[in-house]
């Protein structure tokens, strides 16, 4: 792995976002790290004191107080002496042994220090050989210095450790192993097998915090030495120390305490010393930090010898506690964070990491379907469509919901359950109403009308509403329609109760029929009174409540379902009102064409009329319209409901005349009937066949009616227009 090459890693972006947070924690972490450096360094040195005392008696060379850094360009010759009794497998095992075993081996072997004479046996030690080969490679180090990648050079760290009197025997398999020793280790078959298959080990939970007395780390006499001022420029403060679990082997421990070097204002500067400063960005290895870690591939493990080298004998050392240590994981080319440092990072970065992780875990499948410009265009058009001049008409359900919500909040405020606050309301952009509206022009070659995104009235542009009337009339009509709809809903609730009583009457005993019938009649009478079917003139048709009810499709259905429950007199009044204002109803029904729902109930009412009542109803169609010379018959021939109602009236009259039942007519009824039949035949002969519509039902006795009063030529002409089915030969009745 070439550490000198510049690599752009994804962690650089996370570090740029977290730079401010790292700067704030710099001062706090420095004191913790320096104290941990002193504690761990003194602890390891205190274990090596007996070894160094024995070496002082055996070796005449003394340790200099201020050792200078040896220049890498002048290395001394190295003699590689291999001992036959020291197998490579044993070297790997020594790396993972515990602290006590390491100290015993150091005492038994006589120890190895930097101050001793370089004999053949000492040159075989990789820790001793490291002193002759200059600076180490960054991938061979496993410390917080490689982690952070920020700050000083390796020379500062070497100076601090040399002044503290740390000898090479203190750290067996130190990261300062030379590259020649690395080549020697590469010849080891056991290590090569580990490099080929790096075992996956779960992450280690290294949260061991405690006091020095609890962990057995006692301060040594070296605390009073003057060299302490060189190592720690800040005063001594009682802090928690970084402790390592006694179960963790030496190969998993950092070679020296967690000590990130001092850093300048910039996080990464190009002026750092090449070859001595890590080019790897800050990579925290804590599971609480949301920075992805790189897996330990065999290619990366190849450079990790020394304290971080994987040992094939890792499992035998920890087989008794397999379940508890399944969480351990050998770190990569960087070390674990300080426990207290990791806790601070996790506390400060938890909201940011959770929000980022929440968004990353739910990718938008439609993210790339529309560009940002297209999204803004759609949003703008939708917001324009929300602007309505008649909110109660165009957005009735939202307005009703908002009014209900306001009433609920008012009740809660009245009871003291909630503080007074404004409810959340849909905010729509304010659009100035245009003085004049121009219809969208149809462009040749386009489908339908042109879609104009800047149109102030989208509903008008697509002909969703009529814009022929003035705005004031549209506004008044909207509120009037809303009032009619509310009135219809109230009457419908009463009608549902009447229909429920009618269904129950078929399942109750006969002695209770009278009670239910009385109750039903009472409710029907109440509905009839609410409808307020008072006669009116043509000028007041738009103000009549009953006619307004018939202008709504739901109102027509209400009357059609109510007619069977009304009495004969009440139903006759409704029939008369419908026939009197038939032109008005036909004109307002051009959009919905829902008048046909009234044909069936009205037909049953017509079949129950007497001859005198029939003449009174049919004569309403022969009276001329106000301010016009046309008759209602002319409009009736052009409307399906009108022509069907006219044919039904004529058919019922012919049925009464041809029956044997006494009609008990009034004086002049026959003359009125004859005049009406002649007038209908005259208008029917003048109307073009193309303008006539097909009726809902064509009675079969209409030609028999006309044969009583018309000649043969006129009958054939009417037959062709009505397209009646063929009937047996008939005889014309002379007039």
UniProtKB/Swiss-Prot annotation:
It is found in: Cytoplasm; Nucleus. The keyword Nucleotidyltransferase does not apply. Residues 346-356 have a biased composition (Low complexity). The keyword Nucleus applies. Pfam families: PAT1. Residues 49-59, 67-93 have a biased composition (Basic and acidic residues). GO terms for molecular function: RNA binding. Residues 39-93, 336-366 are annotated as: Disordered. Its main location: cytoplasm. It comes from the Eukaryota. Keywords: Cytoplasm, Nucleus, RNA-binding. GO terms for cellular component: cytoplasm; nucleus. One of its GO terms (biological process) is negative regulation of translation. Belongs to the PAT1 family. Interacts with ribonucleoprotein complex components. Interacts with cpeb. RNA-binding protein that acts as a translational repressor. This is Protein PAT1 homolog 2. It comes from Xenopus tropicalis.
